[in-house]
Amino acid sequence: MTQYTSNGSVGSFALSGDAFIDSLFSPDAAFRTKWAGQAGGSTQISYSFVFLNGFASKFVTGYGPEPTATQHFGVTGAQIPGIDLAFQRWADVANVKFTKITEDAAGNVGDIRVGYSSAVSPDYWGYCQWISNGAGPAHGDIWIEPGVTTGTFQPYTYDFLAMMHEIGHALGLDHPFEGNVIPAGYDDARYTIMSYTQPAGNFYFKPGSTQAQYLVITPMVYDIAAVQKIYGANMSYHTGNDVYAFTPSQPVYQTIWDAGGTDTLDVSAFSLGCTVTLVPGTYSQLTYSDTLLDANIGIAFGCTIENARGGSGADTITGNDAANVLSGNGGADTLTGGAGNDTLDGGSGDDTEAGGDGNDTFNAGTDGGKDSFDGGSGQDTVNFGKALAAVTVDLTAGTASGTAAGDVAKVGSDTLVSVEAVIGSAFNDTLLGSGGNDVFVGGAGNDVIDGRGGIDTVLYTSATGPVTVNLALTGAQNTGAAGWDTLTAVENLSGSAFNDTLTGNSGNNVLNSYAGADTMAGGLGNDIYAVDNAGDVVSEANDAGRDLIVSWISLTLGANVENLTLSGLAAINGTGNELANLINGNSANNVLSGLDGNDQLQGGGGADILIGGAARDVMIGGAGADTFRFAGGDFGGLAIWTCDLISDFSRTDGDRIDLSAVDANSANGSGNDAFAFIGSSAFSKVAGQLRVEVISGLSIVQGDTNGDGLADFWIRCNGAPALAAGDFVL
């Protein structure tokens, strides 16, 4: 009796609910069968070739319902590589692993056997024995009509396509025109190789050849979706940064499955315009000079191809939800981004580019074309950094052009819609804003930048040396490494990677050090400073607004700065000054110290330590096990509205009130004595007692440090938590 060598067991699966996918499954649950999976890994399936080593028909005897025929014989050695590749095409996309074994005299054969049989009618190429529990060891076996013996089974042949089709049956796929019928217009091999209908152009004669090519060389979009529904996806296939490059000399129908990396669909070799889409489950149409192929390059569902390159023709390229880089190259191209932060570069020609959602960047100004840029939603940028001459950009008018007649030929004349940011050239540019919040990068050269309305920002982040910029100056100013710039109606600045000097004006400014040890002075107004270097210096005058430092390093507020917010992911600390400070932590473990003044400390995430300091402070721990720490003299008044406040004490989070630095007995002079917690009991004129009293729905912590039976400090806890001794560090 013939024996399997690996799997041999069959399971079942349910319909997906998708009409396209379910058209490849039997409507009868008894025939909706698959090879049983292996725990914790891919489904292991073996295959073999009948009689390859001359073993006789004993493998038919006792084997069950294999075809009764006068002749069975094996494929040739020259045909095996193509058949192996057909099996691999399915293993590339599905979580199955095919292992080829050699049949032997002991009767060991694969789960799937492949061979020729005279029982197959000459009207058919071959057939596959349907896999089911009732079929016995014959299920999944593929028998080929003997007239195919001259075939090579290589890609671009009908035999290769037919073998992939039969292997699809062996994996459990049905025809899309039987039972659950695929929606109209999709019953052809562009969409599923389980169809009998060939797409236009699939029967192709290469110029100078008399040998026909069949251009479908992979399972297609719905085949991949269906087989992945049954077995799962192969998430190890093509996880690097792959380039899928196509050429006009070889037409093809193909679907791309790629499991990871940053990948590119490349049609740069084409001179005729192509339609390229990166949206999963859709098709691109490549244009060939000698044949018409409609929707010939598919991208499988669940597959993300990030980038696309066009050719020298007028291409239409559409992105997906990832951060795409779409390059039109030559021709009058139409580029459309998706939901991600995309980069669009039309190349030469008069291009039409739309960013879609996300913060998109349009590369412009290199070829003199008349391009159209529509940013859509998000913060979108037109970049003239590679322009060959100066540019004038007017975001109110929505135009960009060369600054003189001679320059237009180098820069072009462009149309801008929904663009909020401009990067200038290396020349003397004029950049004019809109009524909105615009961002400008003048670059090298002596630039004129007018923000007009809104809150506008000039970035010097690309400067090749330190810059000195003063927003209070109205004329041309020598910035140093970035030339003589004239800034009008600009509110915010970002420095370079060097040691800059940034000065604000009488408005509310944002000064961003970016990198380097910078000196920043905001002037009047409520200013915001971004600090990331221990060498950064912030200068503020008295009564010059209420100012904020956003810091990526541990920082102590200097004079006349009121507020501090810690940013980034590092465990850093923030310390206030003598003013009423608002100090916010980040998501890590922070130590926040208010010092003098009526401060508010907010820990955010992490296990934070909050130290209010003198005067009346408000402390908000946020998430995590926070510690509210007090020392002698750190308390406010002896009333609900004047004492220190803990806003969100949570025993569940692990919060503690730390009084270990407070001397519980100030009269004995022996040092730092610990408190004794007495619950809600009244003081008994013993120094060092700590009690909790609920007043107006608030838990009030009271301490007697001199033994007079009266509270010497109050701490208010909102929400009336039932405080116990374990909630304190005494």
Which residues does each PLM region occupy?
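GD-rich hexapeptide-repeat beta-solenoids
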Residues: 44-50, 54-55, 184-206, 210, ...
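Short amphipathic beta-strand/extended segments with alternating polar/hydrophobic composition
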Residues: 36, 57-61, 274-278, 409-418, ...
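Acidic glycine/aspartate-rich repeat arrays in secreted/surface proteins
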Residues: 105-115, 174-190, 197, 203, ...
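Calcium-coordinating acidic loop motifs
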Residues: 264, 308, 422, 493, ...
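Short, surface-exposed beta-strand/loop micro-motifs that present aromatic residues
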Residues: 33-36, 182-183, 254-256, 449, ...
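Short, ordered beta-strand-loop transition motifs
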Residues: 38-39, 104-106, 133-136, 248-249, ...
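Extracellular, beta-strand-rich repeat scaffolds characterized by small/acidic residue-biased motifs
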Residues: 260, 269-271, 280, 309-314, ...
